[in-house]
């Protein structure tokens, strides 16, 4: 039997406290890119009881994604937005979610992300990461932005950290490793970086702005 919404919230309040949980429930977080970073961030924020997620990706689930992304073989070939929504619904049917199966650009970012309190950048390519961060900082100077950079390879997970760059911009990762160096990506290290982003979101929603 699936618990009621009231039972679900009561269980979260027991773990997080009422004031903090209310902050989570009243928040809207956008996750831009639903690959290794984004799909894991979405899972973590759903489990924490964040009230509303905006899930954005244009891609479909591929077999090469399964080593680090929160998808299943039964979902191969389907849009990541639909599959991510399906997966978080299994965790909590009470999490509100909007999906956009589109590629984010400088032109559509204002429309797609205007409702979000916090924006998580979770793209693969450096130029797309920079485009999103720069556009958001220019368009929405009052919004928090978290970006993932440096999570490739089998190096120590302890080198992955969160850093406040300036204002409302935060970076999560080792800021060095790059998949283009031929060192690959593995779930355990990517998930550490995703956890840093998700945890910083929860800290910000709790009013804690320092890393």
Q: What are these language model-derived features?
A:
Residues 37:
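Hydrophobic/small residue at the entry helix of a nucleotide-binding pocket
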Residues 2-3, 112-118, 122-211:
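Glycine-rich phosphate/adenylate-binding loop
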